[in-house]
Structure formats: C-alpha cells, structure tokens
Amino acid sequence: MAVIKGITPEQVAQICIGHYAGVDEVGRGPLIGNVVTAAVILDPNNPIEGLNDSKKLSEKKRELLFEQIQQKALSVSVGSATPAEIDELNILHATMLAMQRAVAGLNIKPTSVLVDGNRTPDFGVESHAIIKGDGLIDAISAASIIAKVVRDREMDALALQYPEYGFDKHKGYPTKAHFEALTQHGVLPEHRKSFRPVREALA
C-alpha cells in the first residue's frame, strides 16, 4: 500500500489505469447507524460531469449524480459495518471491513483500488491511499457520493421511525440537538454504544 499526499497529474495518470476502483466512506463520526462505504469502477468511455467530494455538493446535486453513477459506471458496490461491529472492532477497523465488503461486491474485479484517506485494508490487489482523494480522483468522488446518499437515506428512514431525534437534519452526528434527544428520549438500539456521548447517556 502506498500513501500519496499532494498527488500530481503524472501520478494520477500512473495509477488510474485499467479497471481501478475508487473507494470512500461516510459515517465515521456519527453516534448512530452504519458506517457506509462504496466502491466504484467508472467507464472511461462514458464520463460523468461534475464529480467532486460529496461534502462540497448540494443534496440535490448529489442525488442527480447518484443516479448518473448508477447508470454509467461499470460497477458500483456498497459495503457497511453495523453499530454492533463498530462497538466490537472500533470505528477504524469497522470502516476497513466495510471497505473490503464494498470491493468484494463489485461485479468486476478491480486491477487496483484507490482509497480516500491515509490507509487501506488488504483488498488482495494493489491499493493506494490518497489523502483528499475524494476531490482529486473521479472514481473516489463517485464512491463518496454513493456512500453519502446511501447513508443519508438510511438516516432519513431512521427519522421516520424515531421522529423525535431529528436524524433527517443532523444525520446522526454529535450535534446539540442529538445530545438533547439522547438525554430526553434515551439510547436507541441503533446507537453506537462505544461512543462516549452514548456511553454517558447509558450511565
């Protein structure tokens, strides 16, 4: 595994060859729900305009790109790790597991895997960790969009089940509103019990 910081156009050209997969995660910070990862192999003959780090895109733009990625990419796969797995393994190792699941779910075996961040799990193929890769490599940008939309939809579904928690607004992140809901309404089965605010609410 190589960790690449400040990637140059020449390095991009060297590693973005063959059926390479971009991988990214969403949901390491929230107090509730799955950590969600996605793996995407784009079609160089069917480009998608406007790809970028999902955090820099509006919800409407993410939804539009989500549909385009599903339609135009050669392969798209989502992998998750549950709150129970996060509590058992810790969030870092659970995220690595979710990434492995996403790559394993691709219907094309990638020639290499490019991951946003500073580390990758073992995928059984060449892999590169690219710092800020979600804004530099289109396949990683696409993966960040897929993972973000999937997780946001999971939070919206949870908001319908537990409307008093406001998950549709804060998406499970540790906001003041979430802390107040924990205090007033208690811990849900979907909360991550190993995260300190949840642990303190259980005490």
Curated annotation (Swiss-Prot):
Cofactor(s) named in the record: Mn(2+); Mg(2+)
Substrates-to-products reaction catalysed: Endonucleolytic cleavage to 5'-phosphomonoester
Major localization listed first in the record, in broad terms: cytoplasm
Top-level taxon of origin: Bacteria
Subcellular compartments: Cytoplasm
SUPFAM superfamilies: Ribonuclease H-like
Enzyme Commission identifier(s): 3.1.26.4
Family that this chain belongs to: Belongs to the RNase HII family.
Protein name: Ribonuclease HII
Species this protein is from: Shewanella halifaxensis (strain HAW-EB4)
Top-level taxonomy: Bacteria, Pseudomonadati, Pseudomonadota, Gammaproteobacteria, Alteromonadales
